[in-house]
Amino acid sequence: MIENKIELNCALHTNKNLEFLCLDCKLIPCCTLCISRGGEHHRHGIDSLESIQTSSILSMMNNFKDVYPKVIERIENDQQILKDSDEIFNEIQSQYNKNKITINEEFKKIHNILSIIQLDIERQLTTDFQENTLINTTITSSINNNNNNNNNNNNNNNNNNNNNNNNNNNNNNNNNNNNNNNNNNNNNNNNNNNNNNNNNNNSITDILNISIKYIQQQYNNDDHFKIDSNSIELIKQYQQSLLLLNNNNNDNLNKLKEYNNQTIKFDNQLINDIKNNLKTIYSFENNNNNNNNNNNNNNNNNNYNDNDNNNNYNDNNNNYNSNKAEKLNIEIDENNYKFIKKRNKNYYIYSENNEFPKNKEGIAFGEDCGSLLEFNWNKNLKNVMLLDGFKESLEPGVLPNGIVHLEIGDIKTPLVVGSIPSTVISLTFNDGFNQSLEPGVLLNSILNLRIGDIKTPLVVGSIPSSVFSLALHDGFNQSLEPGIIPQNNKYKDFSSMQGVKYLTLHNIKSELNIGSIPKSVYQLTLRDGFSKTLKPGVIPRSVEIVTLQEITKPLIIGSIPYTVLTVQFLTGFNQLLTPGIIPEGVKVLEFYQVKDLLTPGSIPKSIYSLSFKDGFDQILSPGIITDGVCELYLRGIKQPLVLNSIPNSVTKLDIYNEFNQELTPGIIPNSIKELTLGSLNTQLVEGSIPKTIQKIILYGNIEPSSLDVCKLDKSVLIYKK
């Protein structure tokens, strides 16, 4: 019997009361909708709550007694899941903010590279235009100078012409005075007036005719001619005229040939290739915790073992031993297909004896792959790896067009002209490659080339001039005589994109001499135990960016040429930078996870932009950062800042990415006009930010309200990104 005053609403249908017990479902209470058509307990055995037997109630309560602890456990589990979810989401949110900052930083680097290239092109255009301007000025000055001399002579003759005529007439008058004085005086006056009116229009030829006539008259009267001032002027002009004619006009004609009218053209196909390559510069990786990863790996391994026979992936058919698997990083996907993960690309291992997934973008071919011709149908195939032992023919047309990335190991078949498709833009020769690379085997479509410890020497022409980025990896031991690494014949010419611009040298065994690094190289990276001495002149003056990481031989003065604009010291670089190592002329300087490298004078006064990032571990005592630095970037440094760490020359300051040093008043100088803050782990106080600041940009966990404690002027511009 149910008391009428007690509401017994159904949890599923809140507008209905519980009236029944389901006899088929552990006596779960139900309402009329629960047992109706479409309800969960339709056609189940039921018993009315109004007439329920005591035994049924006891049975239900005992069931509830067993169920309730599980409910409590479920609630606790749900609370734990909720807590874990919040923690994971907070990590995701934090990583999201870091990713946004990383994107901004990386694309800023790309923008800087493009800006530098643009400046180089504009500088080259300006230089060419200045040369053309000089040619024009030289020709104009030469011709105008000659014209001025002639004009001066003409003016002198015209100015003196009247006097000459007057003198001639006067002399005639004097000679005839004895015969008829009065008449001749009248005639002389008339002649003088006529000569004065007419001689202004006389040409040089007319003047000369008059002078010749006068001289002849004098010669007839007397053998001795008296040279007057007018004749002297004509004699001088005669000399200058001969000098003008003797001056070879070929100089100006040759100058005309020196004009250089250029039209800048861009390789749109190459630009499109670069744009497509830019899409491959990033990847998304799951940051799962270790336990989840271990569980997933164990599950994958169990699945693989259980289904080993069904998929024919047993050890007897596998040509890759454990060492090679470790070297190649062989993994197994959710369908038990093996693949090699390299440079964010998956290469699925193909064997003609085993099942293989269709339409994969990346395939690795080993010694049991059979003919590759059947893969011409796969239009999705973009990435190919030829593994050690590959022995199939590589005649032209075997590797299908459409391949973009190609990696070649210790294959047993030679490469010929046409073996590598013209669509390949990225090519890698892995350790052990032992085939000849004659000129023409590598086509001019290749932009990115990586070479490991290959066993055959390179010759001039082995590397095509189209290669834009070249990396020589650990163990490379082939000669690098001048010409092996191609260069553009025109110094620092980015317009044609010919010649290696980006060169990365790992722990190579080849010696570097002057000329080994071509003059086309724009950025040079030395890393991973690079152990060659950098004598002055080895790095050519074309290089504008030098990146150093884990090099073992000390730098000396002159190792880095004065023409370099940017120097980066990456994780693992551990050499003391004595004054002069970084030359005057460098504008941008970046330090990453390095420690105790700097002394006063290490940083030259030419530096405009300075960065300390990702675990930089040195106290920036006053004087380390030199006056002249205008932009300063601080990210995740491990030592506190002190007063006067930042000089007054700095006007732009960026502090971000886990910066956890105190910003006590005075640390940031009053010279700062623009301040960027992001992901700080430090508390701001009044005075942390000088009140002279003009602009603040906020990233990550920094909100505008967190600046209230600084009591900034309302005129300060604050941006949240």
Curated annotation (Swiss-Prot):
Name this protein carries in UniProt: FNIP repeat-containing protein DDB_G0290617
Disordered: annotated span: 143-202, 285-322
Residue stretches of biased makeup (Low complexity): 286-321
Pfam family, one: FNIP
Biological processes annotated in GO: cheating during chimeric sorocarp development; regulation of cell differentiation
First and last residues of every FNIP repeat: 390-432, 433-475, 476-528, 530-571, 573-614, 616-657, 659-700
Organism in which the protein naturally occurs: Dictyostelium discoideum (Social amoeba)
Coiled-coil segments: 242-329
Annotated CDD domains: Bbox2 (cd19756)
Keywords associated with the record: Coiled coil, Repeat
InterPro entries according to UniProt: FNIP, FNIP_repeat
Taxon lineage: Eukaryota, Amoebozoa, Evosea, Eumycetozoa, Dictyostelia
